[in-house]
Amino acid sequence: MFYVNKIIGWVLSPLGMLFLGCLCGALLRRCGGRIGKRGLHRLGTLLVSVSLGLFWILSCGIVTRFIGVPLEGDEVPLLDTLELGGCDAVVLLGGGMGAHEVCGRAEMFSAADRVWEAARQWKAHQNGDLKLTLSGGGVEQSTVPLLKDLGVDEEALVFFPEARNTEEEARMIAASGIRCVRLVTSAWHMPRARMLFERAGLEVVPVPTDYEMHYCAELPLKIKDFFPSADALWRNSVAVKEWVARFCYWLKGCRSR
């Protein structure tokens, strides 16, 4: 299922649809021309045109309001989560960080809000044995230094480097004996992440952050939002990937019933 999700996510991404659509369209045009089938030639032209049209649409900022904002949904509570009850661990999903070999320090990307929020949650609730969990490779050189700078004790950090996705991380955390977590992730990712952690048997206090989709949608609408841009392409690609992931897990849930 892990690799199926990855493949489907790429195929349905704006760049994936453009590449495959244009490739298939070009092959149909070529085959149609060589064997004298005008129908195939026209179908190839149509496929290329549709691919370019979809790429244009999914590269426009206004589309984020329709496919990005709903991901962050009303079910994610917009409140000060510091006031909620304590848990066994703060779970930091991802972190939007990278290690910079040139300058020798961590680099913060668009989702780095997660790291700051995780540190804030840990400092507000740490009682001597509160853990802060991390996953993925390279966090020791990227996320960990920033967490330490923000006041998190290194002894409190627990690593799950083998986890390839959110589902696997949830299972590993549950298997470690942790029962209640404060789950920190981007708002667009929270509904699916919360579902996976609860499915693993964990009690979840959601701590959404990084409301990037809502932030972009709240900006005044401008003419440029109707034209392709790299920023809009990135956000809409993230949105499409998340919708595909939710659909795949929905299918998986239906089959297991």
Named regions from a protein language model:
Residues R34, V69-D74, W250-C254:
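Transmembrane helix-loop junctions in multipass membrane proteins, especially transporters and channels
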Residues Y3-I8, V63, I67-L71, V240-F247:
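Hydrophobic alpha-helical segments of integral membrane proteins
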Residues I57-L233:
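A structural signal for short, hydrophobic/glycine-enriched beta-strand patches
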Residues R30-L43:
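Membrane-interface helix-boundary motifs at transmembrane edges
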Residues M1-C31:
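Membrane-embedded alpha-helical segments of integral membrane proteins
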